Amino acid sequence: MYTTKLVVCLTIIVGLSQSIGCQSDTTKGKTVSISIETTKGNIELELFESDAPKTVANFVGLAEQGYFNGIIFHRISKGFVIQGGDSTGTGRGGKSIYGKEFEDELNPVAPSYKEGYKRGTVAMANRGPNTNTSQFFIMLSDVPMPKNYTIFGKVTKGMDVVDSIAAVEIIPQMGDTDGKPKVDIVMKKVTVKKEAGK
């Protein structure tokens, strides 16, 4: 989500759970595995193709193009999210394989939608309805916020790396706990590993 949108969600959070692991399995359909090599270590994702096919196709397509390689995590909101996927590093850019912004995939019957924004959830960041490109965020805590952002995956390995990214010193931009890392945290390489059926 872009900064103006995310801060609105932050203000309506009614509580944070103290979950210490990643979310439980949420999909029973086709999934895609992703490896993100960062300057802090490796993060592995499972993408929910059955829940959000267009979003997953976009992420996979961009990864195969090498788009994410060298991009930073441009935003950290302590206890909430880390955010990346913008080649400008500002939170105002992005790209999609469709050549334009694309629509949300918010299906109330999808398992991931029902699960909500749990620790380890991977979802699309945007500046409003149907404005998705390449920016995404990873949840640091369970947050009961409105389901306005397409959930398309979860962290399966490397949540400790996500936490280490979240722990770095930031340049505050939206309060003392929300801003850009003082030292760039880079996605060195994003790789599509395999496809699997669950």
Question: What is each PLM-predicted segment?
Answer:
Residues 2-3, 9, 15-198:
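Cyclophilin-like peptidyl-prolyl cis-trans isomerases
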